[in-house]
């Protein structure tokens, strides 16, 4: 069989490089290097640290459960509960750091592709892996053996949808900006999904005696996790809080509500359910916002930036 040589096989027929394409010896390519800004990326590092500590605390709790089954002295339900509660607070800490890194980057004009990618990698650990392990612990260890696989499937589905949600966000962020100035999130953001799981687990752990089986609530956690996985990959729009105008009257009420929420979180009698209420309101708001009047949406937008 004869093989006809292509133009690329004949050196004499190859197109010559133009002067602009010829690499210049000693050329300065520093302008092509990704810009790394210190303060926003320190916040992202704090996010990643909290996620790592959350995963570590969950593993310690799981190890404690095995030691309790083996009858090792010194291990109690209370000590195991403390490990899981620490993991929940570390996830909340990651939410705060994640909020700060974006704010600082925008205020200082320091948004960059590097920061966006670094933030997504940290989010996979803090808001993907840690909540997935928390769900697998809360669900898997209490399900009947014949349907034990359900806990693993639900947990991994959440992690998978969270990672895909972050990948989609990065792709959309790299595209030209919306000419209408729409800054909404497409699908519930993974920090909010993680916060909802952590707050619900925190609520249930305080409603039941330490070491007591959650019973039917196991299946509620399964349904919530599946619902959050679907919402992360949905086209439901959620406010990003990027357009808060501190000079408006609505922002004053936003500050009042935020201060009140912080006070309730730190109050002994309300701290167990306040986070769950906050994350639930955000989740519901995204679902019902299209049904609200334009006037009400505009008023809420001035208050919460959405």
Predicted features by range, described:
Residues 2-99, 278, 289, 295, ...:
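Topogenic membrane-insertion module of multi-pass membrane proteins
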Residues 2-29, 182-306:
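C-terminal membrane-associated helical module and adjoining short loops/tails
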Residues 102-113, 163-180, 233-241, 287-292:
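C-terminal ends of transmembrane helices
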Residues 49, 96, 100, 104, ...:
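Active-site His/Glu-centered metal-binding helix of metallohydrolases
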Residues 52-60, 128-138, 195-203:
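Membrane-interfacial alpha-helical segments at the cytosolic side of multi-pass membrane proteins
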Residues 52-55, 93, 97, 131, ...:
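Alpha-helical transmembrane segments of polytopic integral membrane proteins
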Residues 42, 78-89, 107-166:
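Multi-pass membrane catalytic core of lipid/isoprenoid biosynthesis enzymes
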């Amino acid at each position: 069989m004869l093989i006809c040589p292509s133009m690329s096989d004949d050196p004499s027929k190859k197109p010559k490089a133009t002067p602009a394409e010829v690499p210049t010896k000693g050329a300065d390519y520093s302008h092509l290097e990704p810009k790394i800004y210190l303060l926003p990326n320190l916040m992202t590092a704090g996010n990643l640290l909290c996620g790592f500590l959350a995963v570590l605390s969950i593993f310690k709790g799981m190890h404690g459960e095995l030691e309790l089954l083996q009858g090792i002295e010194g291990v109690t339900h209370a000590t195991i509960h403390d490990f899981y509660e620490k993991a929940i607070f570390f996830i909340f800490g990651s939410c705060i750091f994640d909020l700060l890194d974006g704010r600082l980057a925008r205020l200082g004009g320091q948004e960059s592709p590097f920061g966006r990618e670094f933030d997504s990698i940290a989010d996979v650990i803090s808001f993907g892996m840690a909540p997935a392990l928390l769900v697998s612990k809360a669900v898997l260890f209490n399900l009947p053996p014949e349907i034990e696989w359900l806990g693993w499937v639900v947990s991994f589905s959440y992690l998978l949808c969270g990672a895909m949600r972050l990948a989609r966000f990065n792709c959309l962020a790299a595209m030209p900006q919306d000419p209408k100035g729409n800054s909404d999130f497409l699908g519930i953001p993974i920090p909010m999904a993680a916060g909802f799981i952590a707050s619900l687990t925190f609520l249930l752990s305080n409603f039941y005696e330490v070491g007591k089986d959650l019973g039917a609530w196991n299946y509620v956690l399964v349904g919530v996790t599946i619902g959050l996985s679907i919402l992360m990959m949905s086209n439901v729009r959620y406010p990003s809080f990027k357009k808060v105008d501190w000079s408006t009257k609505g922002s004053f009420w936003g500050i009042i509500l935020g201060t009140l929420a912080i006070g309730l979180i730190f109050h002994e009698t309300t701290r167990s359910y306040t986070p769950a209420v906050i994350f639930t309101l955000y989740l519901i708001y995204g679902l019902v916002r299209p049904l609200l009047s334009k006037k009400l949406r505009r008023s809420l937008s001035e208050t919460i930036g959405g």
